[in-house]
Each structure stands twice: as structure tokens, then as C-alpha cells.
Amino acid sequence: MYKYKVIMTGGGTAGHVTPNLALVPALKENGFEVKYIGSKDGIEKEIIKNNNIPYFQISSGKLRRYFDLKNFSDPFKVLKGIKDANKILKKEKPDVVFSKGGFVAVPVVIAAHLRKIPVVAHESDMTPGLANKLSAPFCSKLCVTFRESLKYIKDNKGVLTGSPIRTEILNGSKEKGLEICNFNKSKEVILIMGGSLGSKIINDEIRGNLELLLKDFNIIHICGKGNLDNNLLDKVGYKQFEYVSEELPDLMSAADYIISRAGANSIFEFLALRKPMLLIPLSKKASRGDQILNANSFKNEGYALVLNEEELINSTLYNKILELKSNKKNIINAMNNMNGKNSIDLIIEVILKSIKEY
């Protein structure tokens, strides 16, 4: 018998979904029944259903910071999304809503507020994303990953919890990861991740440097859907994937180094695994600059090296990887000196407290 019911929401990219999954086992241990509201065709639908969590879909418009003709029609989708979410919440009667952000979350948060249901949100990046900015007035508490984020949260709603780490990420097998890729143990392994949607510029630069890199390293390349290079399918020492789910813990365990974008959820997982990382944040041209702030924070802590997209030319990339290799010991030492509490436990505490105080 469940004590509580939580409806989770968040979507658009994997980064708005995987932290929710990290919380699910602990929520269930604390007596929560867990259900999910997402969009009709977002990445969250497949991820959540694959984890056997009841899923409700709503209409949702995209939140854009740039001009697009769809900006005129999407507000009506958001209004319909509020109506859809309200209908679901009326039927399900959750004790609390937990939001991880993304454009699908806004209608759910507003509907929960209208129904007087407490809302706890979580922001992974240093500065709140647009969805969480819009949601903040309707939230009881907004959990943050970086201490620097608290200054952006009004009305004493901010709580420093850190980023929830999926338990399965910590339990990967190095041997299994090497076996999946058919790698021998004679070379160190670099894992390249361009985010859940892939990154053309990172893909192109890695492949442009491939012959040089394969002299010293084996390469695992998660390149994004539709981005496989058929000419390299049989390349010895190079294993490419469009997207991985179940194999990810083993592939991460097999890696000695990680080259990645700088989304907060991912880099905190790398930190938990003590993996030296070269971060290539999304440029300000393609984002609001949050990944640049995340990456520089990790650089200042000694956890990572940073290479901006503008510097991403062949010689610079290869030299930066060699610099990462030479700094491996120092980076791991900095990571081992980190003081961190269990983020999942802290977030569960905030959720339970919000239910009792609302």
C-alpha cells in the first residue's frame, strides 16, 4: 500500500528525464506511487515507458528564445497542455508534483498550482532554464545543483541538493564494456558523448582526428540518432553507437577519459565515477550559455579541462586530449577531495517536507 503519490514531469531532452529516473527507486522505498506526465512525441515517452512507469501525454508547445512563426501558435498548445494536465491531476490526485523542467513541464506545474498541489522542481544547470523560470512562481521549492544558483532563486525557495545520480550508472562493469566494444586492454579508452541528440561538430572533429587518436586510444563514440558513419563500422578500436541505454554504465566504466558536452546531469555522473573529462560546452550561439558556466565551474574545481567550440580545430582537439591524459592523476585527486552529500536523499527530504507543509 502506497503512502503517497507523485506525478513527475520533464522532457524535451534526456537531461530532463534521467534525473527523474534516478529518484524513482528512492521514492518507491519511501512509499511513493510514481506516475509521469510528458509530451506526445518527446524523448521522455520512450525512456519512461521502457522503465515501466505509467505515462500520461499532454499537448505542449516549445519555449523558444528566438523568433519563429510557431511562437504564435505554441501558446495555444501550452493552454491545451494546462487543460490536459488539469484533467489528469484531477483524476490521479497526487500528493506532490516533481518537475525536472523542459517545455512539457510548464503546463503541468501551472495545473498543479491551480489544483493546490505542491510542486518541487529541480534545476541542473547553474542558471535556471526558461521552463524553470516560468515555473518558479508556482513551485514550493526549487532544488539546485550548484551553490552559485541560489542567488537566482527568489522568495527563499532555493535548496542546494546537488544532482541525483542514477544508481545503475555507478554499477557498470569495465570488462563488459570492453567486451561490448570488442576492445583489448592494451590501450586506454576515450568515451565521446555529444548529448542525447548528438553533436555534428564533435562527431566531425573526432572522425577527422580518428587515425591519430587510434594510435594511442580505443574510442567509444555515442554520436546521436542518424549520425553513424557506415564507412567506419568495421574500424578496429572504434565503436560507434547512435544512442545507448542499458549499456551506458558498462561503457562509462570502460572509459578512462570522457569527451562530452557540459550538461549538468552528465558531468555530475562523470564526477561520481571519477572520470577525467574534456568538456566542449554548447556555444552561446546555440544555447543560453548554461553549459559554458557548468564547464568553467568544473574547470575551476580541477575536475575537467574545457575546450570551447570556437577552438575546436584538429590540432587543438588532439593536443587537449593529450593534456587531459597528462593531467589524469591530478584531476582524479581533485575529484577524490570533493565533499558531497547524497543528492537523492536531500531531494526526497524536500519532497516529503513540501507535502507536510503545504
From Swiss-Prot:
CDD domains (alphabetical): GT28_MurG
GO biological process, one term: cell division
Bilayer-crossing regions: none
Subcellular localization(s) per the UniProt record: Cell membrane
Single GO MF annotation: UDP-N-acetyl-D-glucosamine:N-acetylmuramoyl-L-alanyl-D-glutamyl-meso-2,6-diaminopimelyl-D-alanyl-D-alanine-diphosphoundecaprenol 4-beta-N-acetylglucosaminlytransferase activity
Coiled coil start-end: none
Positions of UDP-N-acetyl-alpha-D-glucosamine binding: T13, A14, G15, R166, S196, Q291
Xref: InterPro entries: GlcNAc_MurG, Glyco_trans_28_C, GlycoTrans_28_N
Reaction catalysed by this enzyme: di-trans,octa-cis-undecaprenyl diphospho-N-acetyl-alpha-D-muramoyl-L-alanyl-D-glutamyl-meso-2,6-diaminopimeloyl-D-alanyl-D-alanine + UDP-N-acetyl-alpha-D-glucosamine = di-trans,octa-cis-undecaprenyl diphospho-[N-acetyl-alpha-D-glucosaminyl-(1->4)]-N-acetyl-alpha-D-muramoyl-L-alanyl-D-glutamyl-meso-2,6-diaminopimeloyl-D-alanyl-D-alanine + UDP + H(+)
First-level EC class: transferase
Location, primary (coarse class): membrane
Record's GO cellular component terms: plasma membrane
Pathway entry: Cell wall biogenesis; peptidoglycan biosynthesis
One Pfam family matching this protein: Glyco_tran_28_C
Keywords for this protein: Cell cycle, Cell division, Cell membrane, Cell shape, Cell wall biogenesis/degradation, Glycosyltransferase, Membrane, Peptidoglycan synthesis, Transferase
Membrane topology: Peripheral membrane protein
EC nos: 2.4.1.227
Family the entry assigns: Belongs to the glycosyltransferase 28 family. MurG subfamily.
Function description: Cell wall formation. Catalyzes the transfer of a GlcNAc subunit on undecaprenyl-pyrophosphoryl-MurNAc-pentapeptide (lipid intermediate I) to form undecaprenyl-pyrophosphoryl-MurNAc-(pentapeptide)GlcNAc (lipid intermediate II).
PANTHER family the UniProt entry points to: UDP-N-ACETYLGLUCOSAMINE--N-ACETYLMURAMYL-(PENTAPEPTIDE) PYROPHOSPHORYL-UNDECAPRENOL N-ACETYLGLUCOSAMINE TRANSFERASE, UDP-N-ACETYLGLUCOSAMINE--N-ACETYLMURAMYL-(PENTAPEPTIDE) PYROPHOSPHORYL-UNDECAPRENOL N-ACETYLGLUCOSAMINE TRANSFERASE 1
Protein name: UDP-N-acetylglucosamine--N-acetylmuramyl-(pentapeptide) pyrophosphoryl-undecaprenol N-acetylglucosamine transferase
Gene: murG
